[in-house]
A protein has these predicted regions:
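Structured alpha/beta or helical-core interaction and ligand-binding surfaces enriched in interleaved
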Residues: 1-183
Length: 183
């Protein structure tokens, strides 16, 4: 069993915090490395999410999704677990714009062989998870913790890994990872 340091309970799900640490993905995974990253993620993750921030307003049918994002959402519909409105998701917390709180639609899906194939077909590189595609692909472990966090608009992504997971993952994917130090 993982070394559990604390238990955090949120209103939407239980999240177990472990000894996992964030590791920044040094170079954007593209092509085979992108597909390898997703396949490695599917080994330890059972869900994924991405986001729609309907700007500038948040009315029922407003969306930032263009045709490619809408097609992907339609294709993934059988895998949809939930669609919620929230101000935060892994790696991001929305602020206020002109005194108005911003909200995003968070799409959560089951990650299985079929949905994995759809993610692989949607694009061939990690930081393309922004318009015209949905924002910020994240892969979630069964305990609710993000395995992969993407902040595509900032060309940033990191993985939460236990120390013993780092070297084997780098060997299998060919990716460079760097321990993410917070200031």
């Amino acid at each position: 069993m993982a070394n559990i340091s604390r238990l955090t309970i949120t209103t939407s799900e239980f999240v177990i915090r472990s000894s996992r640490e964030p590791y920044r993905i040094v170079n954007e995974p593209r092509g085979p490395r992108y597909r390898g990253l997703l396949r490695e993620g599917a080994r330890v993750s059972d869900r994924f999410l991405f986001v729609d921030i309907p700007e500038p307003f948040y009315r029922e049918h407003d969306t930032s999704f263009g045709p490619a994002a809408k097609r992907l959402v339609e294709e993934l519909a059988p895998h949809l677990i939930s669609l919620t409105s929230d101000r935060s998701w892994p790696g991001t917390r929305l602020g206020e714009v002109h005194g108005v709180k911003s909200y995003a639609r968070i799409y959560r899906y089951r990650l299985d062989a079929e949905s994995l194939e759809m993610l692989e077909r949607a694009t061939d590189h990690l930081f393309s998870w922004q318009p015209p595609l949905p924002l910020d692909l994240c892969l979630l472990r069964p305990d609710g913790e993000a395995w992969l966090t993407t902040i595509a608009s900032e060309d940033t992504a990191y993985l939460r890994l236990a120390p013993e997971e780092v070297a084997p993952l780098m060997d299998r994917t060919g990716m460079d990872l760097q321990r993410y130090l917070r200031h």
